[in-house]
Curated annotation (Swiss-Prot):
Contains an atypical KH domain with amino acid changes at critical sites, suggesting that it may not bind RNA. The keyword Cytoplasm applies. InterPro entries: KH_dom_type_1_sf (IPR036612), KHDC1 (IPR051778), MOEP19_KH-like (IPR031952). Transmembrane segments: none annotated. Keywords: Cytoplasm, Nucleus. One of its GO terms (cellular component) is cell cortex. It is found in: Cytoplasm; Nucleus. It comes from Homo sapiens. This is Oocyte-expressed protein homolog. Component of the subcortical maternal complex (SCMC), at least composed of NLRP5, KHDC3L, OOEP, and TLE6 isoform 1. Within the complex, interacts with NLRP5, KHDC3L and TLE6 isoform 1. As part of the SCMC interacts with the SCMC-associated protein NLRP4F. The SCMC may facilitate translocation of its components between the nuclear and cytoplasmic compartments. Forms a scaffold complex with KHDC3L/FILIA, and interacts with BLM and TRIM25 at DNA replication forks. The gene is OOEP. Changing R37P: Found in female infertility with early embryonic arrest; uncertain significance. Belongs to the KHDC1 family. Residues 1-22 are annotated as: Disordered. The keyword Nucleus applies.
Length: 149
């Protein structure tokens, strides 16, 4: 009896995945995200959306980690945007509602911003690699040093 109580006490600190899953199942579901169509957006423009995909990390860069920039983008572009995670978190599906010309303009703008962020990330990775190589080269005692005149 005492051993069972001690075992139970030691198990409280360590939760098994099944136990954690049961705790998650007991939690209430989050409320569904319901969006109301803005007053300035015509209903007929909801019929034919434009859909394209980007990497998930790019969506965080473009729209912010909590997608806080989307309402401002919608207001300035006069288009509605939805960003949904697909492919187990690797891709996001971006849906643009609005007039065809506006849809294409928003898609073009987002793809240009995505290109900029990809280039910025590639440059940052190259700089890290270069810094690592320079530090390794500077700490190598057998490397020839250029004389400073």
């Amino acid at each position: 009896m005492v051993d069972d109580a001690g075992a139970a006490e030691s198990q409280r600190g360590k939760q098994t995945p099944a136990h954690s899953l049961e705790q998650l199942r007991r939690l209430p579901l989050p409320p569904p995200q319901i969006r109301i169509r803005p007053w300035w957006f015509p209903v007929q423009e909801l019929r034919d959306p434009l859909v394209f995909y980007l990497e998930a990390w790019l969506a965080d860069e473009l729209f912010g980690p909590d997608r806080a920039i989307i309402p401002e983008m919608e207001w300035t572009s006069q288009a509605l945007l939805t960003v949904d995670i697909v492919d187990s978190g690797n891709l996001v599906e971006i849906t643009v509602f609005g007039r065809p010309r506006v849809q294409n303009r928003v898609k073009s703008m987002l793809l240009c911003l995505a290109w900029f962020h990809r280039e910025h990330r590639a440059r940052a990775e190259k700089m890290k690699h270069l810094e690592k190589n320079l530090k390794a080269h500077a700490s190598d005692p057998h490397s020839p040093q250029d004389p400073v005149a």
